[in-house]
Amino acid sequence: MSHLVWQKSSYSDAEGADNCLELAQGNGDHRHVRESDNPSVVLTTTAAKLRTFILGARAGEFDHLI
């Protein structure tokens, strides 16, 4: 997965601390998620599933977990 271009949120620590999730677009419909402090562990999902999750997060469906 070294060929992937990983993207962090603009809300991540600007000083480069390992405190965020990173996303990358893979081949076809694959989307990848990893933690910046443990980049060797990667979760792979589809664009549709990731979109559904992000929309739920924006709507506050997971606020009770933070």
Protein language model features and the residues they cover:
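A charge-rich, low-complexity, intrinsically flexible signal that marks solvent-exposed coils, linkers
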Residues: 1, 45, 65-66
